[in-house]
Amino acid sequence: MQAYFDQLDRVRYEGPQSTNPLAFRHYNPDELVLGKRMEDHLRFAACYWHTFCWNGADMFGVGAFNRPWQQPGEALELAKRKADVAFEFFHKLNVPFYCFHDVDVSPEGASLKEYKNNFAQMVDVLAAKQEQSGVKLLWGTANCFTNPRYGAGAATNPDPEVFSCAATQVVTAMNATHKLGGENYVLWGGREGYETLLNTDLRQEREQIGRFMQMVVEHKHKMGFQGTLLIEPKPQEPTKHQYDYDVATVYGFLKQFGLEKEIKVNIEANHATLAGHSFHHEIATAIALGIFGSVDANRGDAQLGWDTDQFPISVEENALVMYEILKAGGFTTGGLNFDAKVRRQSTDKYDLFYGHIGAMDTMALSLKIAARMVEDGELGQQILKGQLSLGKLAQYAEQHHLAPVHQSGHQELLENLVNRYLFDK
């Protein structure tokens, strides 16, 4: 089979002085950072959907890309052609993982029976590709938001037949993820929210999605899946308001339904922006609450109110993110998935590489800066030890006539310190 990316053998590390746009300047997979290989710290993944499914269409224009697998033809054969190109890309980019939605890799078909048959065939194709390439599945998920039947939600839909269709997709995608050795399974409620409260029963919808998640957990244990279940927070789009608004909201939901020990979060940078938070805030909050799982590494635009899904380029932002992750012990089953897409005007097929290479270098440099912060310990925080009751603390304060003086937070000093790590050689 002829290679699609025929002008490239493989992206390799050439060092900071390289001017080759198809080489890494900072990402050296085997470089040791805090005693661990850089590849093992970062656990990079490329996503199927933006990279191979999006045809360049937007709200104001038709598809701008000329991808061979997006032309008219027999659906399964085109899906297999897409898989050929995808794994060629993963191998040449040198990423250890990939991620997918069910209908990214397989034709949906005209019925649930067709959906399951098509997906089963494509899972076999993907398994062979993984075996051949050594690329592994970071996580799988089900697309329960694109089909018109999910217009009023999937797990929150008031129609039990729609709810059942969503359950079918999720159980099938979970089984596929398990078979392919996936390390996580993601649940993103793209339409689990509302457009107006005039036709929405908030209590019922919350109870429905709570029960749905409980069933997902039950199925995980029944099938023996050892990976991590992840919810991906997002405040809005496509709905006006989504129930998984941000990390703190998801934690409250998990606590309500007794799931806080079973499900963690997959945090996307652009979703943090839409929620009015920094990416740093969402990561730190998840770690503090004990539900940090994985990351969708991208960036949004603070001036725009929608998901732009651009590649990350800010070392300043991501060094602080990687600092939080390193302090917490690093990833376990999670990783850095690039939920990002080239711009509509980027029609050259090698633009896919340019976007990912820049993003991987950004995260690699961020990791190295974060490691220096951890090693130096200047940004370390005191760890509370021991336990005292509120009454004993009050008694202590009275006996010792405490009159503490306000201590400076030194924000400016700390910001300057971060800049030293970022910009000093």
From Swiss-Prot:
Question: Has UniProt tagged this entry with the keyword Protein transport?
Answer: no
Kindly list the GO molecular function terms attached to this UniProt entry.
Answer: magnesium ion binding; xylose isomerase activity
Question: Which positions bind Mg(2+) 1?
Answer: 232, 268, 296, 339
As to how many cofactors bind and how, the note says: Binds 2 magnesium ions per subunit.
Q: Name one GO cellular component term.
A: cytoplasm
Q: A GO term (biological process) for this protein?
A: D-xylose metabolic process
User: What class does this enzyme belong to in the EC scheme?
Assistant: isomerase
Q: Per the entry, which co-factors are needed?
A: Mg(2+)
**UniProt keywords, alphabetically:** Carbohydrate metabolism, Cytoplasm, Isomerase, Magnesium, Metal-binding, Xylose metabolism
Q: Which reaction does it catalyse?
A: alpha-D-xylose = alpha-D-xylulofuranose
Keyword Cytoplasm in annotation: yes
Supply the EC number(s).
5.3.1.5
Record: residues binding Mg(2+) 2: 268, 271, 307, 309
Q: Where is the active site?
A: 101, 104
Domain of life (superkingdom): Bacteria
> Main localization of the protein?
cytoplasm
InterPro entries recorded: Xyl_isomerase-like_sf, Xylose_isom_bac, Xylose_isomerase
- Where does it reside? Cytoplasm
Q: Tell me how this protein assembles.
A: Homotetramer.
Q: Could you say which protein family the record assigns here?
A: Belongs to the xylose isomerase family.
Recorded protein name is: Xylose isomerase
The organism is: Salmonella paratyphi A (strain ATCC 9150 / SARB42)
